[in-house]
Amino acid sequence: MKEKKRKGMSNKKVLTGVVVATKCDKTIKVMVSRMVRHKTYKKIVKKRKNYVVHDEYNKCKCGDVVKIQEHIPISATKRWIVI
């Protein structure tokens, strides 16, 4: 059976990360870390990825922990917004 989607729920991804750069206006860089198991050696390894995120009101500072959500493309590299 298919589950019906509740009204107001979105299927956009939400990630949590740390702000690492705030040099540009209305733009921040967020580093998202996750733990994955290495395919061959079976050791748990920390993977990191940086996302360019739209910060409409320039509220975020370096070191802040923020939640980001997928969004339609805002520029060539920005596809995430701060929630």
Swiss-Prot record:
Organism of origin: Ehrlichia canis (strain Jake)
GO cellular component assignments: cytosolic small ribosomal subunit
Biological processes per GO annotation: translation
UniProtKB keywords: Ribonucleoprotein, Ribosomal protein, RNA-binding, rRNA-binding
Family: Belongs to the universal ribosomal protein uS17 family.
InterPro entries assigned to the protein according to its UniProt record, in alphabetical order: NA-bd_OB-fold, Ribosomal_uS17, Ribosomal_uS17_bact/chlr
GO terms assigned for molecular function: rRNA binding; structural constituent of ribosome
Protein's UniProt keywords contain rRNA-binding: yes
Role played: One of the primary rRNA binding proteins, it binds specifically to the 5'-end of 16S ribosomal RNA.
Protein name according to UniProt: Small ribosomal subunit protein uS17
Complex and partners: Part of the 30S ribosomal subunit.
Superkingdom: Bacteria
Gene3D superfamilies: Nucleic acid-binding proteins (2.40.50.140)
